[in-house]
Regions:
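Conserved phosphate/ATP/ADP-binding segment of small-molecule kinases
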Residues: 136-140, 148-218
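Conserved N-terminal subdomain of the carbohydrate kinase-like
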Residues: 11-23, 38-120, 133-140, 288-302
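Short beta-strand scaffold segments in enzyme catalytic cores
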Residues: 34, 80-83, 207-211
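A short acidic, amphipathic alpha-helical/loop segment
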Residues: 56, 127-134, 156-160
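Histidine-anchored nucleotide/phosphate-binding helix
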Residues: 27-37, 132
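Extreme N-terminal starter segment of soluble prokaryotic enzymes
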Residues: 1-4
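Conserved phosphate-binding/catalytic region of the ribokinase-like
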Residues: 184-302
Length: 302
């Protein structure tokens, strides 16, 4: 089934101890769409400026990504620059230029309005809610990402939007901030009262955790000798997770657990190079091979 994603397409300038790139295509919706397209067709809604060329858009071609929802506006594309510390865990933002993204008002093409799987990437909660209103009927699965900025600045708007989604996908610090609870399991109980029935906590180098009424499932981060750039890891994880679910067409506990593995697989490939360099050349057989390696990471007998 087709998977709708609404979020940012951007240009990034990235620097880490492993090198730097001055201008590369990025943005949450970009990483998500590329990762998800390995499993299911993706419908993309985002905005770019006049400086976003045909060659920049090439990342979406040949990947079952429909870009009819990619709006082009007068002005420049959203730009972000950041530098990572030696261990890649700390990030300094060097520049944020919203440009045309500041006026982004998502409008779904008619053919997108019947999407059964919806992912609302990190944009203002009122815009996320407006997207859901444009979808005809209740999606089979709606998931949402947010950040500390919206938790702090628009808490009421965020709470209202959370009432309409099934899955909340955020990192551990955002989970604690949203719930006012340090323990992640207790935090999940608070968040369930806000609307979502499933919480997926992205924990960086410590992996990811899924909590729902059936229990807890944790996956480790895949061990890598030389990770280069964590910028798109979380969005690639989300893309792998949601893409697998859309492709599987069922939401059983076993399917959700496998989706966690495939999300972690896509996130691990993303960090191997700068920007989208690794996902650009990634093959499906590599994904499935790494998924099998994931299974062996914690396999043991009692």
């Amino acid at each position: 089934m087709s998977l709708l994603v609404v979020g940012s397409v951007a240009f990034d300038a990235l620097e880490s101890p492993y090198g730097k790139v001055d201008r590369t295509v990025g943005g949450a919706a970009t990483y998500f769409a590329v990762a998800a397209s390995f499993f299911a067709p993706v419908s993309l809604v985002a905005i770019v400026g006049e400086d976003f060329t045909e060659s920049d858009e090439a990342i979406f071609r040949g990947r079952h990504i429909d870009t009819d929802g990619l709006e082009r506006a007068a002005g420049k594309t959203f730009f972000w620059a950041g530098r990572y510390s030696e261990n890649l865990n700390e990030r300094v933002t060097l520049a944020t230029e919203l440009n045309v993204f500041a006026g982004f008002k998502p409008r779904l093409p008619e053919k997108y309005k019947t999407s059964k799987y919806v992912f609302l990437a990190n944009i203002a909660p009122d815009l996320q809610r407006d997207v859901l209103k444009q979808v005809k009927g209740r999606p089979k699965l709606a998931a949402l990402d947010t950040m500390n900025y919206w938790i702090e600045r628009t808490p009421s708007d965020l709470r209202e939007t959370l009432r309409h989604v099934d899955i909340l996908m955020i990192n551990d610090s955002e989970t604690r901030q949203l719930s006012n609870e340090h323990n992640l399991l207790r935090a999940a109980k608070h968040i369930f009262k806000m609307g979502p029935s499933t919480l997926v906590v992205k924990r960086g180098e410590y992996g990811a955790m899924m909590v729902d009424k059936r229990g807890v499932f944790c996956v480790p981060a895949f061990p890598l000798e030389e990770p280069h750039d964590p910028t798109g890891a979380g969005d690639s994880f989300a893309g792998g997770f949601m893409g697998y679910l859309a492709g599987a067409k069922d939401l059983s506990d076993a399917t959700l657990r496998r989706a966690m593995i495939y999300g972690s697989v896509l996130g691990s490939f993303s960090v191997e190079r700068f920007g989208l360099e690794r996902l650009r050349v990634l093959k499906r057989n590599e994904i499935h091979t790494r998924a099998r390696h994931f299974a062996k990471l914690t396999q043991f007998k009692l």
